[in-house]
Design a protein with these regions (language model features):
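Short, ordered, surface-exposed loop/turn motifs in non-cytosolic proteins
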Residues: 268-287, 309-310, 530, 630-660
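Structured interaction patches on ligand/partner-binding surfaces of diverse proteins
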Residues: 319-343, 693-720
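Short active-site neighborhood of thiol/selenol oxidoreductases, capturing the structured segment around
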Residues: 748-772, 776
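Secondary-structure boundary elements
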Residues: 29-149, 381-563, 610
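Hydrophobic/aromatic-rich core segments of domains that either
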Residues: 109-114, 119-125, 134-144, 152-241, ...
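Short, acidic Ser/Thr/Gly-rich low-complexity loop/linker segments typical of extracellular
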Residues: 284-305, 651-674
Length: 871
């Protein structure tokens, strides 16, 4: 203690003595509003500082402090729990809104008289009344936007639920597994702190008890679970990294047995490399996804605690890279050495077998009575939400609600229907546009936006974008699509939409034009000169501070302009907005992520870090050859079975085709899409492909190739085949009786006849079952061509009837498995450790089972295709 005191400043010593006196006197300093707001601003991203006012954060902090005072569990919360898991408004990368200030009284009343534990369960029921799962794009909706539309993907459901928990003073955090190891997808859920410990729950998916969710089984096979804690957090969890804004912690140890993985990086001469990037990668969606990237320490090492499964490693430094594999056969600490033995021009061709963690299950306990009562509550909550969503615009009432007689009425009605809960805002915008003879332009602008944009953007934002946008100039007059997509469109990248044109014009116009009139650009040279001035202003006036936006939030153009500081991506967003404001078509290229502007019908890469503001990249082309093998796919899909990445400086950058219109390939890119030459920047590329087996194991392949300027490169896509033929893995009783949807009980065999048949037992509305239903719907033509019987079972008569509406075909029969007899027979016959629904099995009339899938499996369709091809 005395040694420590010697090194303290007078201020630190005074603070320490004051704190000691307070503790000894039995009182603790209560956090004030200024303390709370100061804490938020100390660790807040610069994106939030530019996009939201201090009054906004002050109002939210007031409610957080109020909850701590008024809720009965507030006294249980120490400052650490409160500051990091109640006070912060931000959960993920969502747009921040007034949810907390608007719903505090509502939620406080909802949990009145409940214990902290029961209040957490009750809040989740309230969330389920408001929001249910629906897939959507990567931009995260705000809590109020999710409520407005009654839906959200898992990242939005968990953001919404964390916001609701924090509103009533329950510490909560969003937990992500960045990618599953045994199937293609990821997932996010919620952890809550009640009565002294953290527990998990499925967001907007209430169960009768904590630590119960449909993902108990998948979570047991996870490799990594992490959460970003606001501020500099010093808790008991394993810390992955600390940044200026957050502390990333690893909570995998709360769920499964773990091991420590140690990667040592060396150069080609055997010397250790410090400061190298080490990507701990999980195969998922056709790529080696970097779940965590760490820097090597002074010993050339980086370490990470994970589940016990294979993990691919990509390390890079100084323009060189190397790879390695952490194996499942090491249940304890696992160490490997990765040598940086490749550069961008040295080719790589490797096959990798990747095993996920073994199946298991996280224990969950609840009585049958509690489960039954919970199901009744879920049904009632569904009815409340459906009653609300029934008020949305549909094909029947769209024309009446629109109230416009115009040649564009059909297009306007479609937008009104797509707007879901936001239909009033979209109607107001279209009526306003029509009144000002701008309806056609307004509809074209709406077409440039995503469905999510249509569903959460206010009329005033859209109207400002329409009337403030630059008019077409010589570049865009003769190509309306260029004008609509890259000048009129207010969406730049992933930022939330907010007016920006007038703020940018008023700030930059004096710099660009001086005291002269603003003239229309009429020549390519004039356009290039104008673009150079905008780029030059951006370079001089917007400071890049990536470390102050460690969450990679995408700031609005107006927010960046206000504080003149941004991360590099937000600076690009501002620059594109500025170029569009002055009529220069510009974009952030969906595929490569490069900022570009157009002049003379060419896209120019903007180079902010070089002396020249832009140049045209050298281009080449590639084609892809693919020959299906026995049991492999006829036409593998991009971002499910294979991906392409550009390698530059030893690092990989995934080529993104998800935007649909971003490339000539479109959103549904597949192997056949590459049969004709496809244009790419010249350089080195990596083709990654993988065949996922029923066990979750992946047969992966990685090969590099070079695209040269003005030349075509043909690359072979190989989907590796399992050397194991389809084999019998279990038994079932084809003479077993089942209850058809109509009529008396009868045997399975009497329905299927001789030969192979498919059996599917679904849950009622759970996420894994919904995924499986969509997979089977996507295979409807292939299953019809296969021509064999399919038996589909629901949990009740109503559930089975709903399934018939979704999956009916000439070869499909429907039954009821309310007592789980069919499910148990299939799982027990294969000695399956789990019986989680849905259960999908391929069987034959001799009682043999050759395929079984239980629970969450986003690779179901591709696995069934392989099984059908192999039998």
């Amino acid at each position: 203690m005395l040694q420590n005191i010697k090194h303290m400043t007078l201020k630190q010593l005074a603070l320490t003595m004051t704190a000691t006196i307070l503790v000894l006197s039995g009182c603790a300093k209560e956090m004030t509003l200024n303390d709370a707001v100061s804490f938020l601003y100390e660790y807040m991203s610069i994106a939030d500082k530019g996009d939201y006012s201090e009054d906004f954060f002050k109002a939210n902090a007031e409610v957080a402090l109020k909850a701590r005072r008024e809720m009965p569990w507030g006294k249980q919360l120490n400052d650490q729990l409160f500051k990091h898991f109640v006070l912060p408004v931000r959960v993920n990368n969502e747009r921040l809104d007034d949810f907390r200030t608007m719903y505090y009284d509502t939620l406080k009343a909802r949990v009145n008289g409940l214990s902290m534990h029961d209040a957490a369960l009750e809040i989740n029921h309230w969330c389920h009344e408001k929001v249910t799962y629906t897939p959507s794009d990567a931009r995260t909706s705000s809590p109020l936007a999710s409520m407005l539309n009654g839906e959200g993907r898992c990242g939005e459901e968990s953001t919404f639920t964390v916001a609701a928990m924090r509103t009533v003073g329950i510490p909560a955090r969003q937990v992500y597994t960045p990618r599953w190891a045994h199937t293609d997808d990821n997932h996010a859920w919620v952890e809550v702190w009640t009565d002294g410990k953290w527990s998990f729950l499925g967001a907007c998916e209430p169960e009768p008890e904590l630590n119960m969710a449909w993902f108990n089984e998948p979570a047991s096979r996870a490799m990594l679970m992490h959460t970003l804690v606001f501020g500099d957090y010093d808790g008991p969890e394993d810390v992955i990294r600390r940044t200026e804004n957050f502390t990333e912690i690893n909570v995998i140890g709360n769920y499964v047995k773990t091991r420590r993985n140690i990667v040592t990086v060396k150069d080609s001469t055997g010397n250790i490399v410090t400061g190298a990037n080490v990507g701990f990668c999980i195969y998922n969606y056709g790529e080696m996804f970097p779940a965590v990237t760490l820097k090597t320490d002074q010993n050339g090492q980086a370490s990470l605690h994970t589940g016990i499964g294979d993990m691919f490693v990509w390390a890079s430094s100084g323009g060189r890279y190397g790879t390695g594999l952490l194996h499942t056969d090491r249940a304890e600490d696992c160490g490997i050495v990765v040598t940086l033995d490749h550069n961008d021009t040295e080719m790589m061709d490797i096959d990798i077998d990747i095993n996920p963690p073994a199946p298991g299950r996280i224990p969950a306990e609840a009585s049958e009575a509690a489960i039954a009562a919970n199901k009744l509550r879920l049904a009632r909550e569904d009815s409340l939400r459906l009653a609300y969503t029934a008020t949305f615009t549909d094909e029947v009432n769209a024309a009446e609600r629109l109230g416009l007689a115009t040649e564009y009425s059909d297009a306007a009605c479609k937008q009104l229907i797509d707007a879901k809960g936001n239909w009033r805002e979209i109607r107001e915008f279209m009526v306003k546009a029509n009144d000002n003879d701008l309806l056609r332009e307004g509809l074209e602008m709406l077409k440039t936006l995503s469905r999510k944009d249509i569903r959460d953007t206010k009329c005033d934002v859209l109207w400002d974008a329409l009337i403030s946008a630059a008019k077409p100039n010589f570049i865009s007059k003769n190509n309306e699509n260029i004008y609509f997509d890259f000048v009129l469109c207010p969406r730049i990248h992933g930022e939330f939409l907010q007016p920006f044109h007038m703020e940018i014009w008023n700030t930059l116009a004096p710099y660009i034009y001086g005291n002269e009139e603003a003239n229309e650009v009429t020549t390519p040279d004039g356009a290039a000169s104008l673009a150079d001035k905008i780029i030059s202003w951006t370079k001089k006036n917007i400071t890049v501070a990536n470390e102050l936006n460690a969450r990679n939030l995408q700031a609005t153009p107006a927010g960046t302009l206000r504080i003149r500081k941004a991360d590099s991506r937000s600076r690009d967003i501002f620059m594109i907005a500025a170029l569009r404001t002055f009529g220069i078509p510009s974009r952030i290229d969906q595929m490569t992520g490069k900022a570009q502007y157009m002049t003379d019908n060419e896209w120019i890469d903007i180079r902010l870090e070089s002396a020249t503001s832009g140049q045209v990249s050298e281009k080449g082309t590639m084609t892809m050859s693919y020959v299906p093998g026995k049991g492999t796919l006829d036409n593998p899909e991009y971002y499910r079975h294979f991906t392409l990445s550009k390698i530059q400086g030893g690092n990989r950058q995934l080529l993104d085709f998800e935007g649909g219109d971003a490339t000539e390939l479109g959103a549904d890119a597949s192997a056949k899409s590459f049969s004709t030459p496809f244009t790419l920047d010249a350089g080195t590329y990596l083709l990654t492909s993988g065949t996922r087996l029923a066990s979750g194991k992946v047969l992966a392949r990685m090969v590099t190739f070079v695209v040269e300027k003005d030349k075509n490169t043909d690359v072979q896509l190989v989907m590796r085949e399992s050397k194991e033929e389809i084999s019998v893995i279990g038994a079932m009783d084809p003479e077993a009786l089942y209850q058809p949807l109509e009529g008396e009980k009868k045997s399975i065999l009497s329905t299927t006849g001789r030969g192979y048949f498919l059996v599917a037992v679904f849950g009622d509305g759970d996420e894994p079952s919904n995924h499986a239903i969509r997979d089977m719907q996507s295979m409807s033509a292939e299953l019809a061509a296969w021509g064999r019987p399919i038996m589909v079972f629901g949990q009740s008569e109503a559930n089975a009837a709903k399934l018939r509406g979704l999956l009916d075909s000439d070869m499909t029969s429907f039954g009821i498995d309310s007592a789980s007899e069919i499910r148990d027979m299939l799982c027990d016959g294969c000695h399956s450790e789990t019986k989680t629904l849905p259960v999908i099995a391929m069987c034959d009339s001799f009682g043999r089972t050759v395929y079984l899938s239980t629970g969450y499996n986003t690779s179901l369709a591709s696995q069934l295709r392989a099984v059908i091809a192999g039998i």
